[in-house]
A protein has these predicted regions:
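Short aromatic-enriched loop/helix-cap "lid" or pocket-rim segments at secondary-structure transitions
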Residues: 49-53, 136-137, 178-183, 216, ...
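Residue-level signature of the cytosolic catalytic core of signaling kinases
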Residues: 54, 138, 180-184, 230, ...
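C-terminal substrate-binding subdomain of Rossmann-fold SDR/epimerase-dehydratase oxidoreductases
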Residues: 4, 64, 196-301
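NAD(P)-dependent short-chain dehydrogenase/reductase
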Residues: 142-144, 152-211, 216-221, 225-227, ...
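Short, surface-exposed alpha-helical segments at coil->helix boundaries
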Residues: 49-50, 151, 189, 242, ...
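N-terminal Rossmann-like NAD(P)+-binding domain of SDR-like oxidoreductases, especially those catalyzing
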Residues: 1-173, 293-299
Length: 301
């Protein structure tokens, strides 16, 4: 389903366009949708040039969201849609890198909101299931707190200034181009790397933590549907099924190793898809179990 009317081609700005979700979004837009031009801005803290798509309709700009008004090319661009995926995005590192998390997420997003208002753009904000917290506790970590406060700020910008927005709440996205090394690595990315290297899969104690996992293609589809149909709400994008971390590791059929508890750990997580299904027509098409089976089948160790 094309996101845009082919008779009225639109400009699209994507923050974090060289990152995991952003690069897959650009891939999908290039393959199946009509638009005028995409500009990706990324500070490349986790984004990679290897994620770039060579296409004359896509331009990559190395730029931090906090400096979005300092680049003439971006300043003169008039996007109808802004997909804001360029934020500090992990729980545990937010404790040690508190300044980076706070400055990137609060100051960076504030500038993106001003830019969206200036251009009368529709903002598609990527929040996180971690910002909901256990029992709606957003204070588990600085990362979760900043994501929750940014969504609150976005809603207030609508009340105060008439910001056009929608939000997608992703649940543990996995798949092509996911980060597998370093402090920003995702859990499935880490398990895949450990499996390839014949290392035990590391489980943060106690291992009973439950997560909903979302395939990258479902995440991208949810973001596009939200851009097209979403209206000033938060839409959950997930599979609607939760797995314990221990249960996931068992599907790899290899050795496991427990590691100490970490701060900010969330123990429950399952996407409630009623609103996304009703208003966006979203439906999860991929599941984690099949993905892991295919990964093991196609991985030689």
């Amino acid at each position: 389903m094309p996101i845009l009317n082919s008779k009225n081609l639109k400009n699209i700005l994507i923050t974090g366009g060289a990152g995991f979700i952003g690069s897959n979004l650009i891939k999908e837009l290039l393959m199946n949708h009509k638009f005028n031009k995409i500009i990706s801005i990324d500070n490349y803290s986790t984004g990679r040039k290897s994620n770039h798509h060579k296409n004359k309709k896509v331009e990559y700009v190395k730029l931090d969201c906090r400096k979005i008004f300092e680049n003439k090319k971006v300043l003169n661009f008039k996007p109808q849609y802004i997909f804001h995926f360029g934020e500090f995005s992990r729980v545990v590192p937010s404790f040690d890198l508190a300044h980076d998390c706070l400055d990137n997420n609060i100051s960076g997003t504030y500038n993106v909101l001003k830019y969206a208002l200036r251009n009368k753009s529709k903002l598609i904000y990527s929040t996180s299931s971690m910002s909901i917290g256990d029992k709606k506790n957003e204070n588990l970590s600085l990362y979760a707190w900043t994501k929750a406060k940014n969504f609150e700020l976005i809603r207030n910008f609508d009340r105060w200034y008439g910001l056009n927005y929608t939000s997608v709440c992703f649940f543990n996205v996995f798949g092509e181009n996911q980060i597998s090394t370093g402090p920003m690595a995702s859990v499935i990315g880490i398990f895949e790397r450990q499996y390839r290297n014949r290392k035990p899969l590391t489980i943060v104690r106690p291992g009973t933590q439950k997560r909903d996992f979302t395939h990258i293609e479902d995440a991208v589809n949810g973001a596009i549907l939200s851009a097209k149909k979403g209206s000033k709400k938060m839409y959950f994008i997930g599979s609607g099924k939760s797995y314990s971390i221990l249960n996931i590791t068992k599907k790899f059929k290899t050795k496991i190793k427990y590691i100490p508890k970490r701060p900010g750990e969330k123990f429950t997580g399952k996407a409630k898809l009623y609103l996304s299904s009703k208003e966006l027509g979203y439906k999860s098409r991929y599941n984690l179990e099949s993905y892991i089976k295919n990964f093991i089948k196609n991985t030689k160790i």
